[in-house]
UniProtKB/Swiss-Prot annotation:
This is Ubiquitin carboxyl-terminal hydrolase 44-A. Keywords: Cell cycle, Cell division, Hydrolase, Metal-binding, Mitosis, Nucleus, Protease, Thiol protease, Ubl conjugation pathway, Zinc, Zinc-finger. Zn(2+) 2 binds at residues 26, 29, 46, 53. The lineage of its organism: Eukaryota, Metazoa, Chordata, Craniata, Vertebrata. Residues 274-667 form the USP domain. GO terms for molecular function: cysteine-type deubiquitinase activity; zinc ion binding. It comes from Xenopus laevis (African clawed frog). The gene is usp44-a. Residues 185-253, 321-340 are annotated as: Disordered.
Length: 690
């Protein structure tokens, strides 16, 4: 629509909620797909092709104009058309340029009049450095957790009241009453025994023991016996000569010991069932972090490893501020020196981490020394440290919601391609994140080994081994000449398998694809099928006709299956294949492995169990919303992770999801169960021997 009369009446507030990326999701269903912001108030909701929450808001409030947050379209509900014109003050143009600057984190663009809309996300690395905004959301996280706990407590109270009225509930109450009465009787009997024992002890202490005349005669001291001097008594009771006495066994001492012992609190929430706040189109990051935190081996490694102190020491050594004595050779370790001020370093790190986010900020101190460390000269960004801190919070059982400020801050610094609030691909983010974590572990473990204690070096090596091998598998690329039957084998590593859809699901324009669901086993069979090599791709002196086949020759501990739902349509457009892929809770990989591997491995090593699923909601590559299904081992149930909203679900619901990335965990691992060494491997299949 060229001209909409309702735009002329628009008066856009300068502090509109749309300027805060944390509000870029539907307030009702929490999706980030097709989100529309009302231009008359602060309401943000999803479009009519999702749940129609924005349309319902118009029907209730009669606010006609709304702006699509990601595509920046303006729609008028009264005119029932898209709006192309602007008001006299140019508010829509200014709003679009401001939102574009917020997405790209580029604030250099200004209007001709110099007028601008200020966002909560100000310059230099965003709102993460803004202590006020961070403290505000931390308080919101606490309030959300407290509200969640109160709701569950009230729900439990109502359920217990109802259950007490049922026949089974009455039976349970009667059993509990009898159990309490028996426990009370045992407690009374125990108190009587203690009282009798105490009374008996007092009587024995007040009554002098009876002795025979012979013993009394022997006890009398002779005239020559010398009493110990005061000096000898002091020497006997000194700490160097004083012997250990057994711990008191009286009831009073026992009760004191029990009272001082720490009591393990029952967790507020199930460990791992912690939501991650959407900080502005960060659903791709939240879904991947939930997946990684629910992988048991990966999580346990980063819960034990914290590279914060290690990187501070390495940074000090690299800048020449660490003083090393000449008595320590280059390969020596310094455990005593590094452990001398561990408590001071930890307290400083905790203090800075609390005030400046999970990864902290910067300091101007330039006097950091290894022997007597002061505040670090700068707070170094570490993805490993952020994973360690975030996993600790998520699996503490104390928080129902956490805002991953510092994790996003570290991603922006170390992976610039993901800087800003534009919508990103979860598969690309997972690959980049694992690559950066691997590089960080390799760099930290090899720089200045003398500064790192032996235990820390071993732990870094173990975690690096897990990161390298947990998703690592090997493919056998076998090229067979159809004339001379020569086979050329090449071993290729892989960290995930990208599976293409069969040809019947690739359609153009308005054609409709087959409505029959695709099978995951069919996609795996297509991946490992034999393909003919045409032309002179395979250079042989005698013949050129050949065929190629990919087969798995080494299975990873965690199998990542990436379903290639997005394909190019035209030059600059990528469309989504929205067909449902049918997958099972158990996957047998034996049909897709080479025969030599089948002969060496146990049958259980081919069996994989479904552990996590990443879903993409939406129709396009550059838009949509990511959620994840994760199996929680602490509670023994599946959890649907939709940013801050988490709820339990059944495995049947998981298998009905429109999967984008599937994670399968190997049921039985066998490190040496592959035959890649027994296969004839050639560096290049294009030049086989005669």
């Amino acid at each position: 629509m060229d001209k909409c009369k309702h735009v002329g009446r628009l008066r856009l507030a300068q502090d509109h909620s749309i300027l805060n990326p944390q509000k870029w999701h539907c307030v009702d269903c929490n999706t980030t797909e097709s989100v529309w912001a009302c231009l008359s108030c602060s309401h943000v909701a999803c479009g009519r092709y999702i749940e129609e929450h924005a349309l319902r808001h118009f029907q209730d409030s009669k606010h006609p104009l709304a702006l699509e947050v990601n595509e920046l379209y303006v729609f008028c509900y009264l005119c029932d058309d898209y709006v192309l014109n602007d008001n006299t003050t140019g508010d829509l143009k200014l709003l679009r340029s401001t939102l574009s600057a917020i997405k790209s984190q580029n604030y250099d663009c200004t209007t001709r009049s110099g007028r601008t809309l200020r966002s909560m996300v100000t310059a230099d690395d965003s709102f993460i450095s803004h202590e006020g905004a961070q403290a505000f959301l931390q308080n919101e996280d606490r309030a959300f957790t407290a509200l969640w706990h109160r709701r569950h407590a009230l729900l439990g109270k109502v359920f217990r009241s109802w259950f007490a009225l049922t026949p089974k509930g009455k039976q349970r109450l009667e059993e509990e009453r009898l159990r309490e009465e028996a426990e009370q009787k045992r407690e009374e009997a125990r108190k009587k025994r203690q009282q009798l024992k105490r009374k008996l002890k007092e009587e024995m202490e007040s009554t002098s023991p009876r002795k025979s005349s012979r013993l009394q005669h022997q006890i009398q001291p002779s005239p020559k016996t010398e009493l110990p001097s005061v000096q000898k008594m002091n020497q006997k009771n000194s700490p160097t000569t004083k012997q250990k006495t057994p711990a008191p066994t009286s009831d009073k001492a026992c009760f004191k010991k029990i009272g001082n012992s720490p009591i393990k609190r029952k967790p507020t929430v199930t460990p791992g069932v912690t939501g991650l706040r959407n900080l502005g189109n960060t659903c791709y990051m939240n879904s991947i972090l939930q997946i990684l935190s629910h992988l048991h081996v990966f999580r346990e490694c980063f819960l034990q490893l914290d590279l914060n102190q290690t990187q501070e020491l390495l940074a000090a050594a690299g800048s020449g501020k660490t003083r090393l004595s000449s008595k320590y050779p280059p390969g020596a370790e310094l455990p005593r020196v590094t452990q001398k001020h561990t408590k001071v370093q930890r307290s400083l790190a905790r203090r800075q981490s609390f005030s400046l986010g999970l990864s902290g900020g910067a300091s101007n101190s330039r006097n950091m020394e290894l022997i007597q460390p002061k505040e670090p000269s700068s707070k170094h960004i570490s993805l490993c440290h952020e994973l360690h801190t975030l996993f600790q919070v998520m699996w503490s059982g104390k928080w129902a919601l956490v805002s991953p400020f510092a994790m996003l801050h570290s991603v922006w610094r170390l992976i610039p391609a993901f800087r800003g609030y534009a919508q990103q691909d979860a598969q690309e983010f997972l690959c980049e994140l694992l690559d950066k974590v691997q590089q960080e572990l390799e760099t930290t473990g090899t720089r200045y080994p003398a500064l790192i204690p032996t235990s820390q070096r071993k732990l870094i090596k173990q975690v690096l081994n897990v990161v390298n091998n947990i998703f690592h598998g090997q493919l056998l690329s076998q090229v067979t000449c159809l004339v001379c039957d020569h086979k050329s084998n090449t071993i290729e590593p892989f960290w995930d398998l990208s599976l293409e859809f069969p040809e019947r699901y690739h359609f153009n324009g308005k054609e409709t694809a087959s409505q029959r669901p695709c099978l995951l086993t069919e996609m795996l069979a297509k991946f490992t099928e034999t393909e003919a090599l045409e032309g002179k791709i395979y250079a042989c002196d005698q013949c050129n006709k050949a065929q190629k086949q990919l087969m798995v020759c080494r299975l990873p501990q965690v199998l990542r299956l990436h379903l290639k739902r997005f394909r190019w349509s035209g030059r600059n457009h990528r469309e989504k294949i929205g067909v449902h892929v049918r997958f099972d809770q158990m996957l047998n990989m034996e049909p897709y492995c080479c025969r030599e591997s089948t002969a060496a491995l146990r049958a259980d090593c081919f069996i994989y169990d479904l552990s996590s699923v990443v879903m993409h909601h939406g129709k396009g590559f550059g838009s949509g919303h990511y959620t994840a299904f994760c199996y929680n081992p602490e509670g023994g149930f599946w959890v649907h992770c939709n940013d801050s909203k988490l709820h339990s679900c059944t495995v049947e619901e998981v298998c009905k999801a429109q999967a984008y990335i599937l994670f399968y965990t190997q049921r039985v691992t066998q490190e040496n169960g592959h035959l890649s060494d027994t296969l004839p491997v050639h560096g290049s299949p294009q030049s086989p021997p005669r």
